Amino acid sequence: MLNETNYAIELKGITKSFGKVIANENVNLSIKYGEILALLGENGSGKTTLMNILSGIYYADEGTVSIDGELVSITNPNEAIHLGIGMIHQHFKLVEVFSAADNILLGTTGKYSGRGVERKKILEMSNKFGLEIEYDKKIYNMSVGEKQTVEIMKVLYRGAKILILDEPTSVLTPQETEKLFLILRKMKEQGNAIIIITHKLNEVLAISDRVAILRKGHVIDIVSTPETNEKQLTELMVGRPISLEINRPETKNRKTVLKVVDLSVVNEDGTMGLHNINFKLKSGEILGVAGVAGSGQRELCETIAGLMNAKTGAVLYNKENIIGKTPDEIINLGISMSFVPEDRLGMGLVGSMDMVDN
């Protein structure tokens, strides 16, 4: 039974510096069980640093942390999880060649009842929170949304009752985002305390009960979500009035740049990833592709970019078929095409290299 009389978390006077850079200064923040708190702020406002202190990755220079009304000292992530705090990072901490079940069980301590019994516990937890996942599926075959579900299961399996999610929707489709929100609402109903780090105003208003706004390392204000709006949150976040209107310029004399004709793709496991896809993309146009996880968005993008082979069909760039060509060959043809993958860090960047080299 979760303690409903004390705050789940209470931070007082938290200050953290990195050299001369002050990331957080005299931050006071609290959250109760059965509540979703959004931590809102621009990039560099101190949101992630504050939560890294709470999850044991950093240690505060000044201030106190209380869990369930008791002062605690969190010096590493292991201590945090023992106190019931679980953090789902923006870049997932999963072993790609392991299955979902193996990742969930990896590193668990205490009495081990056998793989069959432990899997039964995982399935019971899945049903409790509405978390749907194929537990024998390898991580490298999963969409970003599925990987995130595994991360959530990892912390729940370890007994977390306080969940921190760092930019959880940054690489999710709208459908995956709505599915995540359904899961979070169910967790809230079960009495969990949830903190979401974000800068997406519409999502803040859709999911949270309260909003804490950070700017330059300070908590500027904490507001009740039903009593605020996008305009107020924007002004609190950036410190000045700002227009939310977008003026879209009209493009004339548009011509077809990319044409996909009867495109079919078979996945690594032999299933059909795409079946007879047809569309045109014109210059000066933004084409949106929507669908739930596993509907073929990844296969479509990777096939156009030359990262997957098509079974049948054509991809015409200015009437030239680029199917079967590698990304290098496409570039050598003088075709200016960029591909930003859904897993930006794992597939799109070299983490050990700096920005210029990447």
What is the role of each PLM region?
Residues 2-358:
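Glycine-rich phosphate-binding loops of nucleotide-dependent enzymes
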